[in-house]
Amino acid sequence: MVVRDTVPTKDFSLPHSSEAPERARRIVEEQLAPLLSRVRGHDLVQLVSELVSNSVQFSPPLPDGTIGLHLQRSDEEVIVAVTDGGTHLVPDELAFDSHEHERFGLFLVDSFADGWGFSLDGVKGIWIEMELRDA
């Protein structure tokens, strides 16, 4: 995950339940989407919703029973990370295919985010980056 100490960050704990995607959408809509164009803001909200939905459906929670949502912004970009208690698979083990439903979220992330990656520092996490530009 790309982390810069000099930019504003916020961390949220989401329930490991069907409520989590909606809460994540509301948080991102309020905190980050206004910084992006309408289309890119909508894309970011949808990507985060997909990642949180996958976390609820396919991974166990963090030790405290939640899913982590980390928001970070700078003058150039916004970054969102979703963490859970899932297995620590490397990206090659999570290869995606646009026709494979269970990996479709990664296909969307790869298609719409400006950057993304995995965190393997004690908790499983995926981060996405969207540049603050109109295109």
Question: What is the predicted function of each stretch?
Answer:
Residues 11-21:
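STAS-typified acidic loop motif
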Residues 25-49:
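Conserved short strand/loop->alpha-helix "switch" segment adjacent to the catalytic nucleotide/phosphoryl-transfer site
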